[in-house]
Amino acid sequence: EIVIETETEAVDESTETADTKSAETATIGGSYVDFDNMQFAINGKTYTLGQTTLQELIDDGVTFNEDDIANASNNLNKNSQSSGFRITLGDYWSGQVYVFNDSDAGKTASECYISEVYLPMHIGETQNVMSCAFPVDMTLYELLANERDPTDNRTYEGESHTTDTVEYKKDSTKYYGQYGYKFEFLDGNLQYITIDYLP
């Protein structure tokens, strides 16, 4: 069996506080946590984890970091996940997508499907590039009111801030590991979103 464990590096490490929250809203309807349709949108077009390839995003004109997208033609070993491909959201602000090769042979990264989306929020700022199937300006309380049974819910209370991590996960049927949704909050405001897929 193969263990797939990828630790995503935060692109945005900002911990600045604000009473305001992002005014963004979802462009895709439905449940906040939907394992049958793990979707995200870029520039208003909807894509699905486990189905959409990196090449489709390239063909649609998604603006990637030049250094990252130069690796799209590189070979990705079987049963492997790529490094992140950064998508510019604003000044010093990037989302990331990752691809996964679940075949028995090497493939180029561009041929592989999107397996993970990472979206950091800048509290008090908005962007119109990436969105999800839920309001990305929701609070911790709004998430828990809509999705009542998280797999894991952790709270850390520091001297000046409180962070909460809420996860909704399922076991992979092919690999040893879990996949799903992770929401990270700072003082109740959504700060990081990670959606990852495993077959």
Locate the predicted segments by residue.
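N-terminal, intrinsically disordered, polar/charged segments of Gram-positive cell-envelope systems
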Residues: 1-51, 55-61
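Generic preference for hydrophobic/aromatic residues in regular secondary structure cores
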Residues: 2-4, 95-99, 114, 120
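A cross-family detector of function-defining hotspots
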Residues: 19-26, 55-107, 134-199
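Periplasmic/extracytosolic POTRA-like scaffold domains at the N-termini of outer-membrane
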Residues: 34, 45-51, 130-137, 145-147
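Short, recurring structural edge motifs at helix starts
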Residues: 40-46, 128-132, 168-171, 180
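A motif-centric signal for short, conserved binding hotspots located
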Residues: 102, 107-129, 193-194
